[in-house]
C-alpha cells in the first residue's frame, strides 16, 4: 500500500526500468536522486545489498507497490554512479563501503524478455554510462579551470598597471627573503628599461606641490641618487608617482666599483648597508641615456613636468676632484635640471675630506663657474661639440633625421635641453657624520657661495647595532638613518638662517616620516630604502598619507609646513 510507505524509501519499479533501458535515452539520466543503502548481511545472502532510493519524483504515489523490484547484483568493488529515471537528480556515492561493497547493476536474467529489451546489448550498461559521465566531468573540470585561469589572467593584466597590485607585494617579499640585494636591484632596472613597471595614473594634489627656485615639483617626492646610476629607466621610475629623480653618481670614466657582494639588507630594521663605490658606465654613456630620455619626455605628456638631476663625483684614482666635476658638467650639464655635487660618499677613499670648508668652497665655485660658461660660451653652437653630440645620438636613434626640431628648440631656449629650459641649479650632498663645528663651517661656506640647495644626508658609518651588518663595511641607510638625518636638517636649517633650501634624504618610509622632515626644514624628500622595502607602491602610498596629514594638521599647503617645527619651538 503506497500510502502506508514512507515516500523517501522505495524500491525501483521493474516496469520503469524496462521502459527506460534504451541507449537512445541517455539524456534522460540527467535527473536527480538521493541514494541510501544499508548492507544486509546473512549467511544465505552473501554479496547482496538492500538499495534504498530517496525519491522526490512527483509520480511516486501513482506507482503500484507490487511492481517494485529489488533484484540487485553485486559486480565489482569500484565506485560508480547509480541512475534512476524516477528521480529528479543524481549524486555520486561518497562512502559506499559503509553500505555496500560494490555498485548496483541490473540483472537481466531477473528481468526476462519483453518488447523493450530484445537482447543483452540493448540493456543500458552502468560501466559504459560511468565512463561517459567521467569523461564529461573531466571536460567540465578543464573548462572551469581554463575559465578561471582566463579570468584571473585578465584581472592580473589590468591590475598589473596598478602599483598597489597585491602580487607585487608577494613577489617583493620573496625577493627580500631569497634573492641577493644587487640582483633584485638589477632586475627592477631591467623591468623598467623595457617599460614593464606599473604607473601611477592619479592626479597629484595641488596643495602638496612645492618648488626650489625655478624647479617646480608636482609633488615633494623623488628618487635618491644611487638607484638608477646610469639613467637606463628614468621614465619608468618617474611614472611610479615620483616628481623627480637624481641619476648617478657618475664619474668621467666608467668604473666597476668595489668587490661584490656589496649591498646587504636587514628586513627587520629596514636598513641597507652598501659599499658600491660609484659603479657606473661613465659620463659619456650616461649622457646618451639622458639625451634619449629628453627625446621621450617631449613626446610623453606624463613626463613633461618631471625633474631630472644628476649627481657627479670623482673617479677612484683621481687626485683633483675639480677636474672630474668640470668634465661631467661639460658633457651632461645642459641636459640636467640640477647638478648635485657628491663629496660625502663613504665608499670612495678620501672623498669626505672635500667637505673641509676651504676645499668645499673651491669645489662649489668651480662648478658654478663651469655651468655659467655653458651659457656664456654658447657651447651647443660650437661646431666640434655640436657634431660630437650628433654622433652620440646617432648610435641609438638616428637623431639627425628625426630630431632636428629638437635641436632648434634647444637653441631657442639658451641651449638648455632640460625640463626647465634654464641652467641647472647646484646642490651639494653632505654626510651626517660631522661634528657641530664642521656643520657651522659648511653652513657659512654655503651661504657665502650662494649655493642653490643642499641634500641631507648621505649614508652614515656610525651605526653598529645591526647584527646582520657585523663585519660589513659601507654606509648605512634606511630606518636607522631617519633620526640622524632629521636632526641634521634641523641644525643646518638654523645654521643657514633658513635661506638655503634642503632636500631630505634618509629613512623616509611613510607620510609621517616625510612630514617630520618637512617640518624640520626640508622642501622636498628623496626615497631609496622605501622603494627597496615597500616596492612599487611607495610613491602612491606616501603621497596619500602626506596629503591626509597636511589636511589633518590644518596646513593649507605643503609650503606652510616647511620649517614649522622651529616656529612652534
Swiss-Prot record:
InterPro entries: Aldolase_TIM (IPR013785), DHO_dehydrogenase (IPR050074), Dihydroorotate_DH_2 (IPR005719), Dihydroorotate_DH_cat (IPR005720), Dihydroorotate_DH_CS (IPR001295). It catalyses: (S)-dihydroorotate + a quinone = orotate + a quinol. Catalyzes the conversion of dihydroorotate to orotate with quinone as electron acceptor. Residues 1-23 form a transit peptide. Keywords: Flavoprotein, FMN, Membrane, Mitochondrion, Mitochondrion inner membrane, Oxidoreductase, Pyrimidine biosynthesis, Transit peptide, Transmembrane, Transmembrane helix. Its cofactor is FMN. FMN binds at residues 225-229, 249, 342, 429, 477-478, 505-507, 528-529. It comes from Plasmodium falciparum (isolate 3D7). The active site is at residue 345. It is a single-pass membrane protein. Pathway: Pyrimidine metabolism; UMP biosynthesis via de novo pathway; orotate from (S)-dihydroorotate (quinone route): step 1/1. Monomer. Gene3D superfamilies: Aldolase class I. One of its GO terms (biological process) is pyrimidine ribonucleotide biosynthetic process. Its main location: mitochondrion. This is Dihydroorotate dehydrogenase (quinone), mitochondrial. One of its GO terms (molecular function) is dihydroorotate dehydrogenase (quinone) activity. It holds the Pfam family DHO_dh. It is found in: Mitochondrion inner membrane. Its EC number is 1.3.5.2.
Amino acid at each position: 500500500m503506497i500510502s502506508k510507505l514512507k515516500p523517501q524509501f522505495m524500491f525501483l519499479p521493474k516496469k520503469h526500468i524496462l521502459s527506460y533501458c534504451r541507449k537512445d535515452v541517455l539524456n534522460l539520466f540527467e535527473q536527480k536522486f538521493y541514494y541510501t543503502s544499508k548492507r544486509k548481511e546473512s549467511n544465505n545472502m552473501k554479496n547482496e545489498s538492500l538499495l534504498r532510493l530517496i525519491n522526490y519524483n512527483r509520480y511516486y504515489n501513482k506507482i503500484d507497490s507490487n511492481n517494485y523490484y529489488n533484484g540487485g547484483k553485486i559486480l565489482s568493488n569500484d565506485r560508480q554512479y547509480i541512475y534512476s529515471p524516477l528521480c529528479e537528480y543524481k549524486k555520486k556515492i561518497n562512502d559506499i563501503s559503509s553500505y555496500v561493497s560494490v555498485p548496483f547493476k541490473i540483472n537481466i536474467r531477473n528481468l526476462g524478455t519483453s518488447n523493450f529489451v530484445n537482447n543483452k546489448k540493448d540493456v543500458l550498461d552502468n560501466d559504459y554510462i560511468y565512463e561517459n559521465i567521467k569523461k564529461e566531468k573531466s571536460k567540465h573540470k578543464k573548462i572551469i579551470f581554463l575559465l578561471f585561469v582566463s579570468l584571473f589572467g585578465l584581472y592580473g593584466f589590468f591590475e598589473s598597471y596598478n602599483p598597489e597590485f597585491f602580487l607585487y607585494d608577494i613577489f617583493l617579499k620573496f625577493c627580500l627573503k631569497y634573492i641577493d640585494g644587487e640582483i633584485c636591484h638589477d632586475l627592477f632596472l631591467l623591468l623598467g628599461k623595457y617599460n614593464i613597471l606599473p604607473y601611477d595614473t592619479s592626479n597629484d594634489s595641488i596643495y602638496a606641490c612645492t618648488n626650489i627656485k625655478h624647479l617646480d615639483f608636482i609633488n615633494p617626492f623623488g628618487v635618491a641618487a644611487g638607484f638608477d646610476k646610469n639613467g637606463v629607466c628614468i621614465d619608468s621610475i618617474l611614472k611610479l608617482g615620483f616628481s623627480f629623480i637624481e641619476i648617478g653618481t657618475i664619474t668621467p670614466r666608467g668604473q666597476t666599483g668595489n668587490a661584490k657582494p656589496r649591498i646587504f639588507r636587514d628586513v627587520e630594521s629596514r636598513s641597507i648597508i652598501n659599499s658600491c663605490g660609484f659603479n657606473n658606465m661613465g659620463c659619456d654613456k650616461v649622457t646618451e641615456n639622458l639625451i634619449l630620455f629628453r627625446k621621450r619626455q617631449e613626446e610623453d605628456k606624463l613626463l613633461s613636468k618631471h625633474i631630472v638631476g644628476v649627481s657627479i663625483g670623482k673617479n677612484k684614482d683621481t687626485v683633483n676632484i675639480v677636474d672630474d666635476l668640470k668634465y661631467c658638467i661639460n658633457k651632461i650639464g645642459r641636459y640636467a635640471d640640477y647638478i648635485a655635487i657628491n663629496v660625502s660618499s663613504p665608499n670612495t677613499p678620501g672623498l669626505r675630506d672635500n667637505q673641509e670648508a676651504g676645499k668645499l668652497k673651491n669645489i662649489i665655485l668651480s662648478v658654478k663657474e663651469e655651468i655659467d660658461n655653458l651659457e656664456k660660451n654658447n657651447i651647443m653652437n660650437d661646431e666640434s661639440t655640436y657634431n660630437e653630440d650628433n654622433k652620440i645620438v646617432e648610435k641609438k636613434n638616428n637623431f639627425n633625421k628625426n630630431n632636428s626640431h629638437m635641436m632648434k628648440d634647444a637653441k631657442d631656449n639658451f641651449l638648455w635641453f632640460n625640463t626647465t629650459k634654464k641652467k641647472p641649479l647646484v646642490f651639494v650632498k653632505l654626510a651626517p657624520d660631522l661634528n657641530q663645528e664642521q656643520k657651522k663651517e659648511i653652513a657659512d661656506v654655503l651661504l657665502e657661495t650662494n649655493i642653490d640647495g643642499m641634500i641631507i644626508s648621505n649614508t652614515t658609518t656610525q651605526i653598529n647595532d645591526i647584527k646582520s651588518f657585523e663585519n660589513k663595511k659601507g654606509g648605512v641607510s634606511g630606518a636607522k638613518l631617519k633620526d640622524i638625518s632629521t636632526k641634521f636638517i634641523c641644525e643646518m636649517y638654523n645654521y643657514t638662517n633658513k635661506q638655503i633650501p634642503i632636500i631630505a634624504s634618509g629613512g623616509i618610509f611613510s607620510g609621517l616620516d616625510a612630514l617630520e622632515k618637512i617640518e624640520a626644514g626640508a622642501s622636498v624628500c628623496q626615497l631609496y630604502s622605501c622603494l627597496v622595502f615597500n616596492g612599487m607602491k611607495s610613491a602612491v602610498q606616501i603621497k596619500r598619507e602626506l596629503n591626509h596629514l597636511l589636511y589633518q594638521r590644518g596646513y593649507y599647503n605643503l609650503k606652510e609646513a616647511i620649517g614649522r617645527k622651529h616656529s612652534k619651538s
